[in-house]
Regions:
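Basic, Lys/Arg-enriched alpha-helical interface segments
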Residues: 1-65
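Enriched for short, Lys/Arg-rich terminal
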Residues: 70-104
Length: 104
């Protein structure tokens, strides 16, 4: 089985931190569990990342965009060679990314 290196981008880590802080304001213990689970979800992409579906945003991007669902959040990522680049962590209720908003 091929093992992929997993590289979260700065933007994805900032998204994760922002979500953590939002959850923490309401439920600190839940936020800690959520963040630990998110990191486990990141790591899981090292094995068979193509098991994840194409994201709805995929047709609008040059590179293939896939998603891993984690609770109410979507982990958006792309594959390049044997590396998984985690691009964003977005709440499922948020508008879909466009090439313009993907870097916000």
């Amino acid at each position: 089985m091929t093992v992929y290196r997993v590289e979260p981008t700065h933007r994805a880590l900032a998204d994760a931190d922002e979500a953590f802080l939002w959850i923490y304001d309401e439920a600190p213990e839940s936020a800690l569990r959520w963040y630990d689970g998110l990191l486990d979800a990141f790591k899981s992409l090292g094995k068979n990342p193509t098991r994840c579906s194409l994201a709805q945003e995929n047709p609008f991007f040059e590179n293939e965009i896939r998603q891993l669902l984690y609770g109410r959040y979507r982990i958006l990522f792309t594959l390049r060679g044997k590396t998984v680049y985690i691009l964003r962590v977005r709440h499922g209720a948020r508008e879909h990314l466009t090439p313009e908003t993907s870097k916000e």
